[in-house]
Amino acid sequence: YVSQRLCGSQLVDTLYSVCRHRGFYRPNDGIVDQCCTNICSRNQLMSYCND
């Protein structure tokens, strides 16, 4: 995974791919700002995966 800007369905699809069976939650703290407005790293995406 290369850090990149992800928006809309591309962001959701990438979260499914990164989190796999753990799933992910819908945070209120700005995933769109982190990953759509700015460039998002794999570690940033993984922080939204369920434990």
UniProtKB/Swiss-Prot annotation:
GO biological process, one term: glucose metabolic process
Metal-binding recorded as keyword: no
CDD domains according to UniProt: IlGF_insulin_like
SMART domains, sorted: IlGF (SM00078)
Disulfide bonds: 7-36, 19-49, 35-40
Localization per record: Secreted
SUPFAM superfamilies: Insulin-like (SSF56994)
Gene3D superfamilies per record: Insulin-like (1.10.100.10)
An MF annotation (GO) of this entry: hormone activity
GO cellular component: extracellular region
Swiss-Prot/TrEMBL keywords: Carbohydrate metabolism, Disulfide bond, Glucose metabolism, Hormone, Secreted
Keyword DNA-binding tagged: no
InterPro entries: Insulin, Insulin-like, Insulin-like_sf, Insulin_CS, Insulin_family
Family as reported in the entry's similarity comment: Belongs to the insulin family.
Subunit structure: Heterodimer of a B chain and an A chain linked by two disulfide bonds.
Role description: Insulin decreases blood glucose concentration. It increases cell permeability to monosaccharides, amino acids and fatty acids. It accelerates glycolysis, the pentose phosphate cycle, and glycogen synthesis in liver.
UniProt name for this protein: Insulin
Gene this protein is translated from: INS
